[in-house]
Amino acid sequence: MTEHPNGALAWVNGSDAPEKSAINLGFMALTDCASVVVAATQGFAQPYGLTLNLKRQSSWAGLRDKLVSGELDAAHSLYGLIYAVHLGIGGTHPCDMAVLMGLNQNGQSINLSRELQALKVTSPEALDRHVHQSRARLTFAQTFPTGTHAMWLYYWLASQGIHPLRDVDSVVVPPPQMVAHLQAGRIDGFCVGEPWSASAVQQDQGFTLATSQAIWPDHPEKVLGCTRAFVEQYPNAARVLVMAILEASRFIEHSPENRRSTAQLLSAADYLNAPLDCIEPRLLGAYADGLGNRWQDPHALRFHHHGAVNLPYLSDGMWFMTQFRRWGLLREDPDYLGVARHVQQLELYREAASALGINPWGQDMRSSQLIDGKVWDGSEPAAYARSFRLHALNDSPALAAQR
């Protein structure tokens, strides 16, 4: 299955050999763990002298704790989790963290309950009216207080005129438990990664109101995260780990057939433990929202895109810090660029990509327009954090992520 460019395997010889051959690699039961699972199980790591021991976790808080303690060497992780732990707002003491590469873009969703559907709350405008006119306060679930799902949920609600910290309640629910919580009536909606949004639609437990790629086309999502200590102690192991997962990412996107075989692999009990028909369609970009609408999404879940997905852009890391500031999680502006340069392992990533003949991309920043029309390009992050009409900059106490 694996073919290596000339010179790629030179990394496993001599002084460039990995200092650690067995890597404990954490992941959550989400479709976007695909490149990690494929790398570990389909022969992409062994040529580099690595054995990847996959360790499925039941919650992001548990994954965080094992990553910080060293029980996990690296993990499929939320972008916002890595930065929150680094900044000391992630529910643990501050710990120097590292982003080795991006694992995916797009592919998360906001779903609402069948009860709201029965009340004809099936559009952003209807949700805005309901929130501001109903006496009953809605409860939305996300997966970790500083995670990507919390940030997409907050950003999307705010773009519709709904203050995510004042107008609705927010709770943390692990991804695989989302559908059960919705079915039990404990929550009115959620933001989560696949396959759990599609699963809710398949089980007739509500509908998909918005996708994360509608909020920010080709947004950053999961990363390969670890502690800075791991990179410093095992730099060669970190580099070839990136190479193995880069090759797996490229393989998944090589053809629709490879995406289908990946969906089949992920459906197994050891990984997502979910029906194939909840995984495969949206992995192939085929969406059905549960309201009768179907479309082929041009910004569906992607893992590689010639390396554009995988570069740990400085601006991506900085964006999450601007949102922590916006929502009162940070009480003062961090050194946005300085922190991002410390966390994002750009040099190591580019060495790995270049060795595989993958475009290492010369730009450390990228520019995007989000759903509210605002452009984010990494410039003036402090001003950007202050530029939003809805925020919690001055009147919310500092919050910390809890279990």
Language-model features: locations:
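Secondary-structure end/capping motifs
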Residues: 235-343
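Inter-helical turn/loop segments and adjacent helix faces that build the functional surface
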Residues: 163-168, 232-237
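Conserved C-terminal helix/tail region of periplasmic/extracytoplasmic solute-binding proteins
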Residues: 318-403
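Short gly/pro-enriched beta-turn/loop segments at secondary-structure junctions
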Residues: 218-219, 261
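Short, glycine-/small- and polar/acidic-enriched structural segments
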Residues: 2-165, 171, 188-198, 205-218
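Short glycine- and hydrophobic/aromatic-rich loop-to-beta-strand nucleating segment
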Residues: 110-111, 223-226, 230-231
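Functional cores that coordinate and move charged inorganic groups
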Residues: 175-176
